């Protein structure tokens, strides 16, 4: 038996050690101290960024939100049932990113951009940061192009422009979502891409929205981001930012996009839940101190950007085109209280609001837009010329009607002028009614407004206004298709169009029935 010399053994071991290739890897790791209600406290992590992704065993990720002296508070993105005390937590050095691009059009994704519609993976997509800084003052352009919602009451009295933030506010179940969905449906041929963000809604409601968009041919140019009521508060809080990043993809490349946040009240509630679980001090209505910043940093990202911005962003690939992201945030009020904390915050951030009223909705006026308190601060400059020209008297007529209607309840004998004003107001109110999922073209809308503005409705019974309008539009689209096409393309109002509309309505009233 051969004897091994100890010195030979040590030489062999030394040789092996020298040849061993070990690369040292510095890792920032900590230990999970507590897990409860989707909030994880981690001890031992150093150099963590606010909003940084933290990796836990089993492919679970969290987001650092509280950076304290000796621990980090993180919110778990998704299920946290597999996490336990004593587990390791690693910094990734990355912030949260979601997929962006045209591959998402027609798809339903969650707050992290994962498809949830059963149509397979998204394919090759770019990713972009969820939290981004809004474009600066120098890169912005004034709002001067319209977004047609297809609603007479909105496009005539509270016009929305590309790059505007227009709040839709009102109590529950009075048509806020219906208004936003119809605005999306109306964009199917306008070249505007749409993003619908559902926050804290029932899954059956989201499924119904998807079905309606598909039935009306608008799903193909819409991205739906769904963070339903069954999702964690963290995902409901993140969903609007994810949707905004997806919309910014189009804005930054010289396209136009429209985003609907349905609704930001539920996002504020989710953020309040996260903040209270992170032991942050509560303020008014138990919301944290930065709830204004929660919404302002989101809504400031909706803007119209200049040609220079688009050219710089695309490295010269796109020139001479402006981009826009128009936001329609929705806020739910309690018993019409617009002076609550979150509604007042969002009203002060946005460029106007469409106020929907329960009393009007219950009396059959739908959409229940209260023209008196609704306003569009920048949309007037973007309004289509013909609509602007014909809608001047509509808002005044409605405002005077509401004032006189209250007065007329107490007065028995009214003079002729007051009676005419009341009757005109009633007819205009009736004309502003519109069915759901039936957005109107510019020409159809112009025709209705022209009939009201020029007194062609004076001899029509109030109960017959709706059927008169439908028959009139059908008649014009059949017998005066060229005139309607010209209005739709140009949107101008001149003597020729004035004469054409007048002659057509006179002929219709003389020869047709309704």
Curated annotation (Swiss-Prot):
Record membrane topology: Peripheral membrane protein
GO cellular component: plasma membrane; proton-transporting ATP synthase complex
Molecular function via GO: ADP binding; ATP binding; proton-transporting ATP synthase activity, rotational mechanism
Catalytic activity: ATP + H2O + 4 H(+)(in) = ADP + phosphate + 5 H(+)(out)
Pfam families per the UniProt record, alphabetical: ATP-synt_ab, ATP-synt_ab_C, ATP-synt_ab_N
Residue numbers binding ATP: 170-177
Superkingdom of origin: Bacteria
Cell compartments where the protein resides: Cell inner membrane
Keywords: ATP synthesis, ATP-binding, Cell inner membrane, Cell membrane, CF(1), Hydrogen ion transport, Ion transport, Membrane, Nucleotide-binding, Translocase, Transport
Matching InterPro entries: ATP_synth_asu-like_sf (IPR023366), ATP_synth_asu_C (IPR000793), ATP_synth_asu_C_sf (IPR038376), ATP_synth_F1_a_nt-bd_dom (IPR033732), ATP_synth_F1_asu (IPR005294), ATPase_a/bsu_AS (IPR020003), ATPase_F1/V1/A1_a/bsu_N (IPR004100), ATPase_F1/V1/A1_a/bsu_N_sf (IPR036121)
Sequence similarity: Belongs to the ATPase alpha/beta chains family.
Function noted in UniProt: Produces ATP from ADP in the presence of a proton gradient across the membrane. The alpha chain is a regulatory subunit.
Record note on quaternary structure: F-type ATPases have 2 components, CF(1) - the catalytic core - and CF(0) - the membrane proton channel. CF(1) has five subunits: alpha(3), beta(3), gamma(1), delta(1), epsilon(1). CF(0) has three main subunits: a(1), b(2) and c(9-12). The alpha and beta chains form an alternating ring which encloses part of the gamma chain. CF(1) is attached to CF(0) by a central stalk formed by the gamma and epsilon chains, while a peripheral stalk is formed by the delta and b chains.
Name of the molecule in the record: ATP synthase subunit alpha
Provenance organism: Pseudomonas fluorescens (strain Pf0-1)
């Amino acid at each position: 038996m051969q004897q091994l010399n100890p010195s030979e053994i040590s030489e062999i071991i030394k040789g092996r050690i020298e040849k061993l290739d070990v690369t040292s890897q510095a890792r920032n790791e900590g230990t999970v101290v507590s897990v409860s209600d989707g909030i994880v406290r981690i001890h031992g992590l150093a150099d963590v960024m606010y909003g940084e992704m933290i990796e836990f065993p089993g492919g679970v990720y969290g987001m650092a939100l509280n950076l304290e002296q000796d621990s980090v508070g993180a919110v778990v993105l998704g299920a946290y049932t597999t996490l336990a005390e004593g587990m390791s937590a690693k910094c990734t050095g990355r912030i949260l990113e979601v997929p962006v691009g045209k591959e998402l059009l027609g798809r339903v994704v969650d707050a992290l951009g994962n498809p949830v519609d059963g149509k397979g993976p998204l394919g090759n997509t770019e990713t972009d940061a969820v939290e981004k800084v809004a474009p600066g003052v120098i890169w912005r352009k004034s709002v001067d192009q319209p977004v047609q919602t297809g609603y007479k009451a909105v496009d005539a009295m509270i016009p929305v422009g590309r790059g505007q933030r227009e709040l839709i506010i009102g109590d529950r179940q009075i048509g806020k979502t219906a208004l936003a969905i119809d605005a999306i449906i109306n964009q199917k041929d306008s070249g505007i891409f749409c993003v619908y963000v559902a926050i804290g809604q029932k899954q059956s409601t989201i499924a119904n929205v998807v079905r309606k968009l598909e039935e009306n041919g608008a799903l193909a140019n819409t991205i739906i981001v769904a963070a339903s009521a069954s999702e964690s508060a963290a995902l409901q809080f993140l969903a609007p930012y994810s949707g905004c990043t997806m919309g910014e993809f189009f804005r930054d490349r010289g396209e136009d996009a429209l985003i609907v946040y349905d609704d930001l009240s539920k996002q504020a509630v989710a953020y309040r839940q996260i903040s209270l679980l992170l032991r942050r001090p509560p303020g008014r209505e138990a919301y944290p101190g930065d709830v204004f910043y929660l919404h302002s940093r989101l809504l400031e990202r909706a803007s119209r950007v200049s040609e220079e911005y688009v050219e710089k962003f695309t490295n010269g690939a796109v020139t001479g085109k402006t981009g826009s992201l128009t936001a329609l945030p929705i806020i739910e009020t309690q018993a019409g209280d617009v002076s609550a904390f979150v509604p007042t915050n969002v009203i002060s951030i946005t460029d106007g609001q469409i106020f929907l009223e329960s009393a009007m909705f219950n009396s059959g006026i739908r959409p229940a837009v209260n023209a008196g308190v609704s306003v569009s601060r920048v949309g007037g400059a973007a309004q289509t010329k013909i609509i602007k020209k014909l809608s001047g008297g509509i808002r005044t007529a409605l405002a005077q009607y509401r004032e006189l209607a209250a007065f007329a309840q107490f007065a028995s004998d009214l003079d002729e002028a007051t009676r005419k004003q009341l009757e005109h107001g009633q007819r205009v109110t009736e004309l502003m009614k519109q069915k759901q999922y039936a957005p109107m073209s510019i020409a159809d809308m112009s025709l209705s407004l022209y009939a009201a503005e020029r007194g062609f409705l004076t001899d029509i019974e109030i109960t017959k206004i709706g059927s008169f309008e439908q028959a009139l539009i059908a008649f014009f689209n059949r017998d005066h298709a060229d005139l309607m096409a010209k209005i739709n393309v140009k949107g101008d109002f001149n003597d020729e169009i004035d004469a054409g509309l007048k002659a057509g309505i006179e002929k219709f009233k003389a020869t047709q029935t309704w």
